[in-house]
Amino acid sequence: MSHASDTLVMGKIGAPYGVKGWVKITSYTDELDGIFSYTPWLVGQEGNTKEIVVDQWRTHNKGLVAKLVGVETRDDAESIKNLDISIKAQQLPQLDGDEFYWRELVGMQVVTEQGYNLGVVKELFETGANDVMLIKANLKDAFGQKERMVPYLIDQVVKKVDREAKTIQVDWDPSF
């Protein structure tokens, strides 16, 4: 069994494709076929997964299809439809010291350069212009905020990320 923090959902198994056990694949990776860079997959729902290896894959109509080891028939393929595809966190490439996976930033305290605690990173998302941190404000926030959205702009807004202390220092006006 895996703990949620030890695994990452990278995609989902879709409907059967044909009668020989092929399945459609939805990939959540930046590059559509990036999901195939990771092996084995942990297929299932949180806490109830099994390792599966991709035998073959190809693009099909702007999507992906794959033949998985042990999935031989349409019925086999139907039995895994809509299951998550996860990988172990250790399978991700190592990043340089000043680079971070978003999952590492979630849960960190965000503090201004003046020492004001803005709250905890709840999630990050893309806007097209730049990435944004959604911060859950402290219950007794002096400015009455429940949540804040702060751009994740290295050097301009984000001044320092401290993995050990689990803090992100920002140049940001807490009243905004």
Swiss-Prot record:
The keyword rRNA processing applies. An accessory protein needed during the final step in the assembly of 30S ribosomal subunit, possibly for assembly of the head region. Essential for efficient processing of 16S rRNA. May be needed both before and after RbfA during the maturation of 16S rRNA. It has affinity for free ribosomal 30S subunits but not for 70S ribosomes. Keywords: Chaperone, Cytoplasm, Ribosome biogenesis, rRNA processing. It comes from Pseudoalteromonas atlantica (strain T6c / ATCC BAA-1087). Residues 97-176 form the PRC barrel domain. This is Ribosome maturation factor RimM. InterPro entries: PRC-brl_dom, PRC_barrel-like_sf, RimM, RimM_N, RimM_N_sf, Transl_B-barrel_sf. One of its GO terms (biological process) is ribosomal small subunit biogenesis. It is found in: Cytoplasm. Its main location: cytoplasm. PANTHER family: RIBOSOME MATURATION FACTOR RIMM. The gene is rimM. Binds ribosomal protein uS19. GO terms for molecular function: ribosome binding. Belongs to the RimM family. GO terms for cellular component: cytoplasm; ribosome. Pfam families: PRC (PF05239), RimM (PF01782). The PRC barrel domain binds ribosomal protein uS19.
